[in-house]
Amino acid sequence: MQPAIQVWFGEDLPLSPRSPLTPRHGPGLANVCQYDEWIAVRHEATLLPMQEDLSIWLSGLLGIKVKAEKLLEELDNGVLLCQLIDVLQNMVKTCNSEESGNFPMRKVPCKKDAASGSFFARDNTANFLHWCRDIGVDETYLFESEGLVLHKDPRQVYLCLLEIGRIVSRYGVEPPVLVKLEKEIELEETLLNTSGPEDSISIPKSCCRHEELHEAVKHIAEDPPCSCSHRFSIEYLSEGRYRLGDKILFIRMLHGKHVMVRVGGGWDTLQGFLLKYDPCRILQFATLEQKILAFQKGVSNESVPDSPARTPQPPEMNPLSAVNMFQKQNSKPSVPVSIPKSKEKQGRPPGALVPASSLKGGNLGSMSVRSKLPNSPAASSHPKLKSSKGITKKPQAPSNNASSSLASLNPVGKNTSSPALPRTAPCISESPRKCISSPNTPKAKVIPAQNSADLPESTLLPNKCSGKTQPKYLKHNHISSRDNAVSHLAAHSNSSSKCPKLPKANIPVRPKPSFQSSAKMTKTSSKTIATGLGTQSQPSDGAPQAKPVPAQKLKSALNLNQPVSVSSVSPVKATQKSKDKNIVSATKKQPQNKSAFQKTGPSSLKSPGRTPLSIVSLPQSSTKTQTAPKSAQTVAKSQHSTKGPPRSGKTPASIRKPPSSVKDADSGDKKPTAKKKEDDDHYFVMTGSKKPRK
């Protein structure tokens, strides 16, 4: 203990750049562990005067040498404390026989061979504490048995012994020197309060010499030298009485080497007091906590490299958030954000999944259409069809059919038909839901190629012409059946079975085989869109512009279960034609179409009559058309059933379709009336059944 205190408080400690302060100020905060150690040593240093005083007092009472440095080790087994009880009781009896009656006298049991830290040591300590309570020691001065046995609370042990000295001093027993100094100070304070400073000066200071005390105070006050404007002033008032800053305190010399300051009911060293109250020295203590915290933060920032968790990670693109972004930027060309295929599958489970290859090959037509569209963001995002597909999936979580239609709608609406995007984007979520109800008829007709082509139109129409677009798609189905009766029937059955949710978008696919007829349909659909939606007619115009893609590409797109934008170009044309034909009946048949969609079943269950036909055609679900030619009625039925998740498209059917569709395109012009009659009859039957429901 002594060497450590000498190191911290001695005058020979060399100063280093890291600890520029004098030893009395401590080592500074360059090393927190070293500073903590110094704080502990400083606390022990303030205890050292009490340790020495108590060791001298106990040595005199017990007649044995008690070392101040090992005071706790001497007391921790409780044997000396029990012996102290016997000595004090005997001294009280001999010193003051009259007052001894008030002092409790009793035999305290003691295990004299108790080992340090043992249960018997705790038992001895507990017996001592019980006696302390009997003689009137206040609870504030008492300590726990563990505090002494394990050396946890030395200060409290010393304060308890000092309190015992105060109590026994009333019975004529010599107390510790600190207790004597307390009595002198109390007497001086009493004289100061009653008379004046002159009387207090006459009080004999038995424990200190005036000259030595004053020199010691001056030395401590001037070390280190301070030239601060707010220098802490120490003013001499009288012998042992000084003004320290704004406080008047009593200072005493203990055993000729410790300058002690009476603070409250206890004692502190003058050095420790100045460290706490001197503005020049308080820096290391009053702001100790803040400084240590700041220092630790600085160390952690400098030494610990930024962990990956700390480094800001780019936010993960949320499909819905991406959709919202596109809606806001619908007027501007936007690049869709690519989404993992796994996410795409989740977005459009039924038939919305579109492999990258199909997007590239199957969507060529749709890409060209988008690029041609004046405002379509797709023009700028042709290479990112995959991402657009992923985006379309995002708003379509509500249902498989809706998701598939949205898959086609979103890429097209966002990429293909930017003019309608402002309107379509906000309603994308609504259109998918509506598409669910109306996809039934278009589902059978939905073909990957038309999906992308029709998507622009449908995306343009979803908000305003949801009702009209549905009839148009129905017309598309009829027209395509006329042009491509066999191929359309196969396409309807395939798309309906495979792409239940993307029927509308798939319906334009039927026109795939007949690129010419699809082009015509796109023209008509553009006209109908213009009449029905006004601004939506622009995307339809863009759709006819889309270049048709070979039937093989359309087949591959269908096989890949991807929205075939290429094939969609031709279906777009066909759909446009059908839309032109159905524009007149669109307004009339909208309720019918809605009711028909409701009848169709799964699609009507989701949102019967809500989804516009344009929305239905929008979905770019990858559906493989089946070659099996069916009647227009079977096509419509299959379209209704296609609302279920699109099954893996049949590649052979799709392969067959292109040629058949080409033939149908030729025959579509010749036999449009017959197919129209069949389709119209079936359509009217469906509508009639739904009208009574409405």
From Swiss-Prot:
Mark out the compositionally biased spans (Basic and acidic residues).
663-683
Functionally, this protein is described as follows: Cytoskeletal linker protein. May promote and stabilize the formation of the actin and microtubule network.
Q: Tell me the tissue specificity.
A: Expressed in the pancreas, heart, liver, placenta, brain, skeletal muscle, kidney and lung.
Give residue numbers for the modification (Phosphothreonine): 441
Record-linked PROSITE patterns: CH, GAR
GO BP, one annotated term: microtubule cytoskeleton organization
Q: How does it assemble?
A: Interacts (via CH domain) with F-actin. Interacts (via C terminus) with microtubules. Interacts with MAPRE1.
Q: What are the recorded GO MF terms, alphabetically?
A: actin binding; actin filament binding; microtubule binding
- List locations, semicolon-separated: Cytoplasm; Cytoplasm, Cytoskeleton
**Where's the GAR domain?**
208-281
Q: Which keywords fit this entry according to its UniProt record?
A: Actin-binding, Cytoplasm, Cytoskeleton, Microtubule, Phosphoprotein
Q: Does the keyword Cytoplasm apply?
A: yes
Region listing for Disordered, in residue ranges: 299-694
Please identify the protein, giving its name as recorded: GAS2-like protein 3
Q: Which Gene3D superfamilies match?
A: Calponin-like domain, Gas2-like domain
A GO CC annotation given for this chain: microtubule cytoskeleton
Organismal lineage = Eukaryota, Metazoa, Chordata, Craniata, Vertebrata
